[in-house]
C-alpha cells in the first residue's frame, strides 16, 4: 500500500499563507469532507488536473495544518 503522506505537501507561501497540496484526488476528497463535516475549518480549494490545493490562509501555521492532517489520517 502506498503511503498517503507521500502524496501530500504542506508549504507556506508569503502571499497565500499555508497551503496543503494533495496529489491523491480520493484522499483530497476525504480530507475536504473531514474539514467541513468534522471541524468546520475555513479554507479555499483549487482543483487541478492531478492535484488539489487547500489554502488555509495566513492565520494558520504549518504545524497546525500538519496536526489537522494527522488527525484526519487517524480517522481513516
Give the label of every model feature segment:
Residues 24-27, 58-64:
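Helix N-cap motif at beta-to-alpha junctions
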Residues 34-49:
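Acidic, low-complexity, intrinsically disordered interaction modules
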Residues 17-19, 42, 55:
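Ordered hydrophobic segments in well-structured contexts
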Residues 11-15, 45-51:
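Short, ordered beta-strand-loop transition motifs
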Residues 50-60:
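A generic structural motif
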Residues 31-35, 61-73:
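Charge-rich, low-aromatic oligomerization/scaffolding segments with amphipathic character
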Residues 2-37:
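N-terminal acidic leader/helix
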Amino acid at each position: 500500500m502506498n503511503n498517503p503522506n507521500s502524496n501530500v505537501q504542506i508549504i507556506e507561501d508569503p502571499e497565500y499563507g499555508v497551503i496543503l497540496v494533495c496529489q491523491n484526488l480520493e484522499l483530497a476528497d476525504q480530507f475536504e469532507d473531514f474539514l467541513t463535516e468534522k471541524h468546520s475549518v475555513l479554507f479555499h480549494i483549487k482543483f487541478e488536473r492531478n492535484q488539489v490545493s487547500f489554502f488555509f490562509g495566513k492565520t494558520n501555521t504549518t504545524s497546525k495544518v500538519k496536526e489537522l492532517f494527522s488527525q484526519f489520517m487517524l480517522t481513516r
